Structures are given as C-alpha cells and as structure tokens.
C-alpha cells in the first residue's frame, strides 16, 4: 500500500491534540515510513506575508492581485522551524520533488521569493513543521481505525475553505464524518 498523494482523515475518536480533526496530505510513503503535512490547521496570527517579512523577502515585481494574507499551516509536530511549500507544478526551484502530476513540494527559499509575484506557482500552501511515521507505524494506526484514507484532491488541498477540509475529504468517500461512531471494531 502506497499512500503518497493521499489524504489521511482523522477519525472522530482520534483525540490527539495535534491530529484531532486533521487532514494530512501524504507527501511520501515508502519502506522507510511516511511524511505528510496537515492542511487544515492554520497557525494563529501567522500569514505568508509574515513569513516573507521575517525572512526579509520583498516580492518583486509585486502582483497586487495575489493575496499574501493566506495563513501558514502547522504541518505537524516535527521540525516546526522548517518550511514546506506544497504547490502546483512550476519548474526551476532548487529543491522541489514531484508528488503527483498536480502537486510538488519545495523546501528551498527560492520558491518563497516568487510568492506574490507573477512567477509564483498557480496554487501554494505554506506549512511549518511536518508529520512523520516510522515504517509500519501508519499502517498500524490505520488498522486501529485512527484514520480514513482517500486519494488527494487538488481542489480540497488548495481551494476548499480551511474549516471545511476535514468534512470535504471524508465526503470524497461518501461519508458524513459527523455521523461516524467513535466506537471502533473489526468484522
């Protein structure tokens, strides 16, 4: 099972403070484990514009039609000082990895320098920190009914209002997440 380019949807019974009602976009899943970013937990009072100012990046030429007041997301509990940018394909960045035909992840500063300019990727999501699972750990959590999985959807990732992403991801499975029992079992 390879869950790269899938969403993990936290089951209602998952009460962990970081992952409660989370949608995690899985960027990588292989024999070493899995790595992903929470896409529905914005950081309080922290926008892309704040990040650019903190890093002394002045978008030039500035395109006023591109909003920089978009939130930065808490990607997960690990390395919360490291930035990750999910974006639609746009070549030329120093450290980009293609996740799917619709999505890339970049960790180099050069992508930040394009934000707010005409050369930025069409869609972006900026996160600090990431989520990771050791080999077999995610599979164990799936067996324990902690998560639902569904192939990722570019519209949910980049366009669905943040407060609706958890429910929208579950709806891809035909499920109203609010109607799921918190009791788990196996047939």
UniProtKB/Swiss-Prot annotation:
Belongs to the UPF0301 (AlgH) family. InterPro entries: AlgH-like. SUPFAM superfamilies: VC0467-like. It comes from the Bacteria. GO terms for cellular component: cytosol. This is UPF0301 protein PC1_3712.
């Amino acid at each position: 099972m390879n869950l790269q380019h899938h969403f993990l949807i936290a089951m209602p019974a998952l009460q962990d403070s970081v992952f409660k009602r989370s949608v995690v976009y899985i960027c990588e899943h292989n024999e070493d484990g899995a790595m992903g970013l929470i896409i529905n937990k914005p950081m309080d009072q922290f926008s892309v514009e704040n990040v650019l100012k903190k890093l002394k990046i002045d978008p030039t030429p500035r395109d006023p039609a591109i909003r920089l007041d978009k939130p930065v997301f808490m990607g997960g509990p690990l390395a919360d000082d490291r930035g990750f940018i999910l974006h639609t394909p746009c070549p030329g960045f120093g450290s980009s990895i293609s996740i799917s035909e619709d999505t890339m992840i970049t960790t180099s500063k050069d992508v930040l320098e394009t934000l707010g300019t005409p050369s930025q990727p069409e869609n972006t999501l900026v996160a600090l920190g990431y989520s990771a699972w050791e080999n077999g750990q995610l599979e164990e959590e799936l067996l324990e009914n902690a998560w639902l999985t569904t192939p990722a959807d570019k519209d949910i990732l980049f366009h669905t209002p943040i407060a609706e992403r958890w429910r929208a991801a579950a709806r891809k499975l035909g499920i109203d997440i609010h109607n799921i029992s918190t009791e788990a079992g196996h047939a």
